Amino acid sequence: MRVSREKAAENRERILIEAARLFREHGLSGVGVDALTEAAGLTHGSLYSQFGSKERLATEALGHALVASSVRMSDAATLDDYVSRSMSADHREQRGDGCVMAALAGEIPRQGVAIRHSFTDAVRAVVKRISSLMPRQRKSEDEALAVIATMVGALTLARAVDDPKLSNRILSATRMRLASRLSRPASSSIS
């Protein structure tokens, strides 16, 4: 029985949503095709007819997750708001819906070209978003890169440690340090 175009589009969207969630929760290599199809409520055939391979699915799911994250964070009016949301205990606990970069950065270097390219595009998009929220005197791509690297590193560490107090301190210290750093005028020289 053939599936209508509308139903095929719904199936594709469902697979992307579930794959993005599972990849963030378990890693790219920690999720098999069986788990992906079961979570989406579809067959192996529908997955392969839509994407052709797990790598292509991972590439598209990564892009899909980044768009969803970007939409969720787009209502942050200030950089402080963006940092506060990203460095919160709620965000730390939302592995399946949280930061793709913190969830997958350690795995991406071992992936294929397409996945790495998609991840690189995501980094550029987040840097652009962060830069757009920076005060005029601090706006620079390098400053935005430092902010995202700090936040991804902090969230990764906060998720990795088994001590809840230390995890909270990592998030809190990062929020305070970034707030302090970003409230100062940019210096003309690098020290």
Please provide the spans of the model-predicted regions:
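Alpha-helical bundle regulatory/interaction domains
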Residues: A65, T78-D90, Q111, I115, ...
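Helix-turn-helix
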Residues: E10, R14, E18-R56, E60
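Amphipathic alpha-helical segments that line or abut small-molecule/effector binding pockets
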Residues: I17, D80-R92, G106, L145, ...
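Amphipathic alpha-helical segments used for helix-helix packing
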Residues: D81, R92-T120
